[in-house]
């Protein structure tokens, strides 16, 4: 299938030079970009008769598909369920854990589908999921059906709290925790061997673990080593809050990143989620190891993680680290809209440090596209509009009020636009969102089922006004 999208008003390529093409045309052949350039040049190189489909792009602007570097598909049914007054540790141990324990395999599949449908409406074409709480097969099959590009795995942890926290049960403990690191690693290896490379390589499977206190140091180090042996990656939460860092220092004499680094747990195949509480020397350790970071600005804002006060993301990027953006789970980040994260990161460090040169629109867009792709080990194939790369892209409707009028398209994408003006989202050379609908799923039926299942999960989890909003778990 050869497709010509001609006379685009602009194309933000996010290539090495951040080239902005005005009056551009793009040739898509099957699942890849075959030619990109000025419309007049493309017309001279390709006969119109050679195309199976020609799309008038004169009212469209094109950007690379957005890449969500940290998301929880298993959490999608928890939208706006947890209180608005939780710090990170209370949110995890007293609300998220009981919720996850109540999610069945069928719930998880429905949550994954509705999460991915929302992603497509928001221009996201690729994601890194923390992993299934139940049967990975169901989530993999959901990704295959919806058509997104993604990475998933089997969620793993191996350190139980010394005492069962309020609201937890022994059944819940068995659901969440493997008996030890070795059994967790065996399951991770099986999962990777079963599912990595599904759907012609569009779906990858990693050795993902929860990270931080619910995982032993052996599991942190072992997951990365296993991933290296299998030729895949791993991701986990670490340094997610100053509270976590202080507990780590009191218990182990080191902050979280330094502790894992001392044990040999950092590496180029590791994506650390959040990474809010780090010291300067830990940035050096991560940079030297090639470790990547997924920053979730909206979660930091809601859970008071302190990114604007103690976060060192500008320093990480200045050191040469790949820092992508993530939406996290909807109970923390609010939704699957990576454009919201892009807007936040473009401006939050300007404001908190009173330095208007920090981050900005150009860097924010790179974080949401190419740097996210590099973090996920997919930088050679996606993340920018370049010949030979996969045809994953977003078309904005420039006849929308968000674009009437506009000057600099780069600033307009980051500061002015929203998913409301997204006309189409393409993955692998296929338009998965167009005409106001996701074409691979019955969205109305999906929303109805998601609402029903969400209410049942919350009831089974016992999440009520009596659920604690502070915690001493793992202290």
Predicted regions and their residues:
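Metal-coordinating catalytic core of metallo-dependent amide/deamination hydrolases
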Residues: 141-277, 281-283
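Histidine/acidic-residue-rich catalytic or RNA/ligand-binding cores of hydrolases
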Residues: 242-255, 282-288, 304-316, 332-350
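Active-site gating loops and adjacent loop-to-helix segments of metal-dependent hydrolytic enzymes
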Residues: 77-110, 158-179, 242-267, 289-292, ...
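Active-site microenvironment of metallo-dependent hydrolases
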Residues: 1-24, 29-34, 45-47, 366-475
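His/Asp/Glu-enriched, well-ordered alpha-helical/loop segment
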Residues: 262-269, 314-400, 416-417
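Divalent metal-coordination and catalytic microenvironments
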Residues: 8, 26, 31, 59, ...
